[in-house]
UniProtKB/Swiss-Prot annotation:
This is Small ribosomal subunit protein uS3c. GO terms for molecular function: rRNA binding; structural constituent of ribosome. It comes from the Eukaryota. It comes from Pinus thunbergii (Japanese black pine). It is found in: Plastid, Chloroplast. Part of the 30S ribosomal subunit. GO terms for biological process: translation. InterPro entries: KH_dom-like_a/b, KH_dom_type_2, KH_sf_prok-type, Ribosomal_S3_C_sf, Ribosomal_uS3_bac-typ, Ribosomal_uS3_C, Ribosomal_uS3_CS. Residues 47-119 form the KH type-2 domain. The lineage of its organism: Eukaryota, Viridiplantae, Streptophyta, Embryophyta, Tracheophyta.
Length: 217
């Protein structure tokens, strides 16, 4: 029987780097780990709620977190940073920072947030998954959506892309899995620079699961 493994964890330390950089004592490790997840969720919710692009999706590629004793550094890699920087004449980042600090409920730590623009946003699976989710919510046919997403990725010169959507596609009674591929995606090659994401989306027919693998050059 096939064994499934997360493609990012499979390549950690080879072609993928950690997205959280810190050290904690054993008694504090789980607390800090939960805080990291809360920070990422808070940032994603803020961007989706307040700062939306003309296409109506946030465009966050990834969030990196570094910790020191009294300082948390957060770097947001985003496809459309101008929307966050322009919001409220440059106050968008400050509002986000205050929201995260309130969520952490801590007055003795500092928080620094930096924004970095992703040069080619549609090379990132998280951004493509948001695009696909938006189209599925609008009831665009899933095959048309997958082909358009592959076309967007190929325009930005990815070596290969594979998309899988699972659930009650087009409202059919029986759930199924459909996928499409462009180029080559060697999933079993550890040294292949493959980026991956899983993104659930709620539709009127239920929850659909979107998986995207992208082979970078």
């Amino acid at each position: 029987m096939a064994q499934k493994i997360n493609p990012l964890g499979f390549r950690l330390g080879v072609t993928q780097n950690e997205r959280s950089h810190w050290f904690a004592q054993q008694r504090n490790y789980s607390k800090d780990l939960r805080e990291d997840q809360k920070i990422r969720t808070c940032i994603e919710n803020y961007v989706r709620t307040h700062i939306k692009s003309s296409s109506n999706y946030g465009g966050i590629a990834r969030v990196e977190i570094r910790r020191k004793i009294d300082l948390i550094k957060v770097k947001i890699y985003i496809g459309f940073p101008n929307l966050l920087l322009i919001e409220g004449r440059g106050q968008g980042i400050e509002k986000l920072r205050n929201d995260v600090l309130n969520m952490l409920d801590s007055v003795d730590r500092k928080l620094h947030i930096a924004i970095e623009k992703v040069a080619k946003p549609y090379r990132k699976p998280n951004i493509l998954a948001e695009y696909i989710a938006l189209q599925l919510e609008k009831r665009v046919p899933f095959r048309k959506t997958m082909k358009k997403a592959i076309e967007l990725a190929e325009r930005e010169e990815v070596e290969g892309i594979q998309i899988q959507i699972a659930g009650r596609l087009d409202g059919k009674e029986i759930a199924r899995v459909e996928w499409d591929r462009g180029g080559r995606v060697p999933l079993q090659t550890i040294r292949a620079r493959i980026d991956y994401c899983y993104y659930p989306v709620k539709t009127i027919y239920g929850v659909l699961g979107i998986k995207i693998w992208i082979l970078e050059e």
